[in-house]
Amino acid sequence: MDQNGVNEGTGHKSVDLIQIMDKWQKKWTEAKIFEAEHDLRDKFFITAAFPYLNGVLHAGHLRTFTIPETIARYQRMKNKNVLWTFGFHVTGTPILGLANQIKDRKEDIIWAYNNLHNIPMDELLKLKTPEAIVECFSKKATEAFKRMGFSLDWRRNFKTDDKVFSKFIEWQFYKLKEMGHITKGSHPVRYCPKCENPVEDHDLLHGEESTTVEYSLIKFTSEFDGKEIIMPMATLRPETLFGVTNAWVNPNEIYVMAKVHDEIQKLDGEDVELKYNGIWIVGKECADKLKEQDRKIEILKEIKGNELLGLKIKNPVTKKEVPLLPADFVEMGIGTGWVMSVPAHAPYDYVALRDLGKIEEVGLIPLIEIEGYDKYPAKEIVEKLGVKDQNDDELLEQATSKIYKDEFHKGKLNENCGEYAGISVKDIKEKLTKDYLNSNIAEIMYEFSEQKVVCRCGEKCIIKTVKGQWFINYSDENWKKLAHECIDNMNFAPENIRQEFHNKVDWMKDKACARKKGLGTILPFDENWIIESLSDSTIYMAYYTIARFINEGLTPEQLIPELFEYVYLGNGNVEEITKNSNISKETIEEMRKEFLYYYPLDWRCSAKDLIPNHLTFMIFNHVALFGREHWPRGIEINGYVTIEGKKLSKSKGPVLPVSEVAENFGADVARFYITTCAELPQDADVKFKEMEKARDNLIKLYELAVSVMEEEKTEKELSLIDKWLLHKTYSSINGAETAYEEFQLRKIGLMFYELINDLRWYKRRGGENNNVLKEVVEIWTKLLSPVTPHLCEEIWEKLGYAGFISQELYPEIKLEMVNEDLELGEEFIKSAMEDIRNINGVAKINPEKMYLYTADDWKYDLLEFMNENSEKNVKALIPMVMKEDKFKRHGKEVMKLINEIMKIGVKKAIAEVEILENAKTFIESEFDCEVIVNGEDVKGKKKFAIPYKPAIYME
């Protein structure tokens, strides 16, 4: 077992999956069967979020990429002209940071890339530049895709640092600026002090899901050390200011007294003016944060927290003075080092005051009325839950969460809130914050939603107000309306993810789109900046449509903005563009046709981590740049991947490189397992023992194909069990089609395992018709080929067919082969045999005779009646049944039977006597006794028979 937990040597003695994989990958490459160009067929365009190349492709990539790969192959079988291709994301700072870490021989990085990413040490130590890393991992990613048998059009591949791709991005940014979507200003951004750059999600080692939270700093005042001072309190709920009874200070921590000046940015450039804002006392960490957020901080002195105890501070709204009290729970890493205390509504504050014995002294001030609570909600819920003291964290969290949720959704401000009385809590924050800011009793401070936010370089990130920064104004309400419209008209898999996209659009704020360092496209209208990696990856799907033309040898100089303007928007004069670009008119027109043919994008596939960034940005940029007819049509989201219960980690492991999985298990086993082991939104846990089982079952299909070809073809009349197997197989065609169309690939796996069980049952029931088995294998080879293409190509060839199964059409259902009665009949036999075994197990006898009794006719009549009224529940059904004379005379037995049938399931009536007679020999062989169907009613057992559940007597 290696560092990633993979067992080596998992081949199978009868089938060499690696050899089969090699064979068909070579044939596909030589035949170029996956290269796509516009023609007269219906098109299908699917993409996945391209991988970032700061490591090898891992198990998470495998799942995310194999889903669209499978769908692409399925859509080809539906005679669609499928465009499915890939690019590589390399821009930004992570690759630059990795190069520096390798150059510095950072031990943990060297270990991880040598042992987890499987980079030989001599090769690894050469990766000292971003260019070397890009070259290394682009080759490895390409090889991984090919080893997995992905059906990609490689002519369209590109990297985001390609100069030709940069020309496309330049055009995009010119357009966005022209539309007013890009502005320059001063905004708070997530920032790395070491890299001297704003950082995005992909730049982070920890805290990828952190957001920037806006706190209100309420300016309480006091006198200390002979000076008038401001003691700002950070809060997310400014309405609670009306209920403050005291404030908390951590007596064991260091605070600072400092002169504060606001930095006011001048209209032009990045220069600022300073405006005096008083003397503040805040926590030492807070002072460092404020320096980065438009304030100049001049430290006057340090103060121990216990020196401030007993100080009276004035509430700027109520004008009341409240005391500072000690609390060890005050965290200096969040806010200002002070915490307002609102004990009537905050369980933590109430319990802390109770522990100090200060409740009577400071009192409780109610400010929110909530239906279902008394005057003091915090006191009520603390007593109800039995919270003992401040250390009872679990109950305190429960209490806080409950009250805050109820206050937000059901609470209204009371008379203690003056002019704001009667306003609901959920509507008050924005108004109050605005009023407080205008009255100069509050300011804004920004914090992370998570405390641990670390850049990939290892530096702790801060929130910094960057001046002269370029932003994309995603906060624009009109732009958001278009994004919502797009989302409303898109398909989503799973469907319930739609609302999350709406939420992300609502929450979207202006976003820094450029930085000073890293790989990427120079901002065309300000060469001091480089476009960052979450902004150059929003519409590249459109680039795929014309990439094959560009990759044939067009130069960056030829890719003028007017070319993209014409190809994507139809604007401009082709002759003029030809003249200025030196690209032939024919090529330009072909590029335009290719774009118009393949756009819009039918499906975009990704893991759920890209919802708040890449995917939402894709929607925004498409609705800004393209007409409605070219807006994206669908997004598929899958869960994450773990390895034997362990979370993937590029630095600590496991990683499970894609190429390693392919070599150890074979591409088909990996593809089958990763797409079918979990439902789409669920996280998939890779278990190697289960992968081995999947491999063994796939090989059974191959071995069956070989065996049916080795036996001579003979014409036989179809038996009932033959017809049953054909029914099951042809029924699978529609089931698999629905699964593929709806991205429910786990169902394909479940259907395949059902096939394996069906084949076992068929053999057990005496099935031996080679023609039937060949037909079953042919159909299932087609159904499985999108998931396991190499093995299916091999089986297809073994069955004697020429050409590629990858180019075959989806199988058509033969309605004459579908008969639900056959399936119900076999399930009836299985159920009866299970009942026989259960009776045998209890009675512990070896019967010589077995009597099987089917139900009386009136019971089947009742079943038919229930089928005709299947929408009715038991309560509604019984009065209807009892109106019928043929049922009424059976009295209480009817009601009992209705419940029993409901328990079994209301199914259509079948010819149970005929089915049992047909299966009699089989049942006799299974239990080694004589079977009598509806013979002498021994000991009155027949009356216990109900539809689908024969009565049984043994002797």
Curated annotation (Swiss-Prot):
Stored SUPFAM superfamilies: Anticodon-binding domain of a subclass of class I aminoacyl-tRNA synthetases, Nucleotidylyl transferase, ValRS/IleRS/LeuRS editing domain
Coiled-coil region(s): none
PROSITE patterns linked: AA_TRNA_LIGASE_I
A GO-annotated cellular component: cytoplasm
InterPro entries to which the protein is assigned, alphabetical: aa-tRNA-synth_I_CS, aa-tRNA-synth_Ia, Leu-tRNA-lgase_arc, Leu-tRNA-synth_Ia_arc/euk, M/V/L/I-tRNA-synth_anticd-bd, Rossmann-like_a/b/a_fold, tRNAsynth_Ia_anticodon-bd, Val/Leu/Ile-tRNA-synth_edit
Residues that hold ATP according to the record: K650
Alphabetical list of Pfam families matching this protein: Anticodon_1, tRNA-synt_1
Gene3D superfamilies per UniProt: Class I aminoacyl-tRNA synthetases (RS), HUPs, Isoleucyl-tRNA Synthetase, Domain 1, leucyl-tRNA synthetase, Valyl/Leucyl/Isoleucyl-tRNA synthetase, editing domain
Enzyme nomenclature, EC number: 6.1.1.4
CDD domains assigned to the protein according to its UniProt record, in alphabetical order: Anticodon_Ia_Leu_AEc (cd07959)
GO molecular function: aminoacyl-tRNA deacylase activity; ATP binding; leucine-tRNA ligase activity
Protein name according to UniProt: Leucine--tRNA ligase
Higher taxonomy: Archaea, Methanobacteriati, Methanobacteriota, Methanomada group, Methanococci
Gene: leuS
